Amino acid sequence: GAVPCGKDGRQCRNHADCCNCCPIGTCAPSTNWILPGCSTGQFMTR
């Protein structure tokens, strides 16, 4: 099930302790310095 996360409340298929949504809808922890909340790996992609 998708969970709301990020300031826009976008539905993401995955959940993390620090959940944010990238423009492409990826839900990931805020570990990316350049794009906070965006994961550079595939382990958190939808």
Swiss-Prot record:
Expression by tissue: Expressed by the venom duct.
Protein name: Iota-conotoxin-like M11.1
Species for this entry: Conus magus
Residue positions, PTM D-methionine: M44
Keywords: D-amino acid, Disulfide bond, Ion channel impairing toxin, Neurotoxin, Secreted, Toxin, Voltage-gated sodium channel impairing toxin
Intrachain disulfide bonds: C5-C19, C12-C22, C18-C27, C21-C38
One Pfam family recorded for the sequence: Toxin_19
Entry similarity comment: Belongs to the conotoxin I1 superfamily.
Residue stretch(es) of the prosequence: 46
Gene Ontology CC annotation, any one: extracellular region
Written domain comment of the UniProt record: The cysteine framework is XI (C-C-CC-CC-C-C).
Function summary: Iota-conotoxins bind to voltage-gated sodium channels (Nav) and act as agonists by shifting the voltage-dependence of activation to more hyperpolarized levels. Produces general excitatory symptoms.
UniProt GO MF annotations: sodium channel regulator activity; toxin activity
Main location: secreted
TM helices/strands, residue ranges: none
Record InterPro entries: Conotoxin-I_CS, Toxin_19
PROSITE patterns assigned to the protein according to its UniProt record, in alphabetical order: I_CONOTOXIN
Subcellular location per the Swiss-Prot or TrEMBL entry: Secreted
